[in-house]
Amino acid sequence: MKPTTFAIRGTVCFSTDSQNLTCLENAFIVCQDGRTAGVFPELPAQFEGIPVEDVGDQLIIPGMNDLHLHAPQYAFHGMYMDLELLEWLNQVTFPEEARYADLSYAEKAYSIFAEDLRQSATTRASIFATLHVEATELLMDLMEKTGLKTYIGKVNMDRNGTADLQEKSAVVSAGDTVRWLTDTAGKYENVKPILTPRFTPSCTDELMNALAELQRTYRLPVQSHLSENQSEIAWVHELCPNTSFYGEAYDQFGLFGSPDCPAIMAHCVYSSEAEIALMKKRGVFVAHCPQSNTNLSSGIAPVRRYLEEDLHIGLGTDIAGGHSLSMLRAIADAIQVSKLRWRLVDDSLKPLSLEEAFYMATMGGGAFFGKVGTFLEGYEFDALILDDRGLRHPQPLTARERLERLIYLSDDRCITGKYVSGNKIF
């Protein structure tokens, strides 16, 4: 039987809020029944005799929470980066996602994705599948086995797709969604369903009404896209002339989040003042996707503004608009693009600090999953052990310096251990 209480000793780094990063060398972090019991300079007497894993000088940090990625697109990540969003969807993404009607192809592709995500810095994620029920259930089966905690959504789209990737009607789309929810109810320990209208241009009002009814019935969170690209925003305005901004296209159906059933909205590059106010009112989680926003020439989201407004905000890799599964890379990308926005767009919004971007990847995005993303007492014990011995330096570095260097210079090969809710993944 696995021990319900154990400790790991090493150099521990974690956020306490968006501005503060705690770093403790030679510290003990105690996990009890899957949650953090505390971080201590010495092991308290009450925990005397528990198993202790000593990782030496390696870094111990919270697991990363990826708020936005597309599993079927992993098959072409790192390719076709010379297109903007709408062209990229029609020429590359939709044809690839159509292949997942073939379960043998889906199994090959999703098996690669699931294993690579297991080996990555990500411990929790909110994932788009495709509109295919069977392939989505296959992805859920594979992700369950990884031990990672994920939300996975069967995509809904009944317009503006392609002949091979579009549901026949709102009735068919809603019916398939009910079948998927029924098939998977109570089946998983690690995987949960999330309603996934692809984005407003892909969903008729009839479908959005049906999804709103399902949301109320099943009490499910929602994930979608918001204000990613200027052409997309103009298209939404044409499709929904009764709305004054993109977010209202979701909110009019009750699909823009609530305190007990939050919504993740990816990108939010061009959100208006009114949209930001509604996002704050509804408790929307912004999934900032800096790499994708760069690759698809979408723009740079005003993340500093969202932090100042105290919006919920985390990071997303947005595979395959983003080319890397690494959430460490996403942290560095978020900092870098914020500097460009400050220099080129709006010098009133200062760049992100390391503390802020690290918080977004851990505690900020982790809040979507509950008490997740830090080593404060009572939070679920999701952890990474990072070995930076391959990065040589002529003099000793502080723990913060080592963490920053790993974020900028490492890849996932530096990860020597991974825990989710106290369970050791590797």
Regions found by a protein language model. Give the residues of each.
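Alpha-helical scaffold segments that flank or form the walls of functional sites
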Residues: 30, 77-148, 173-187
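C-terminal cap of metal-dependent C-N hydrolases
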Residues: 15-17, 380-426
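His/Asp/Glu-enriched, well-ordered alpha-helical/loop segment
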Residues: 245, 252-259, 304-392
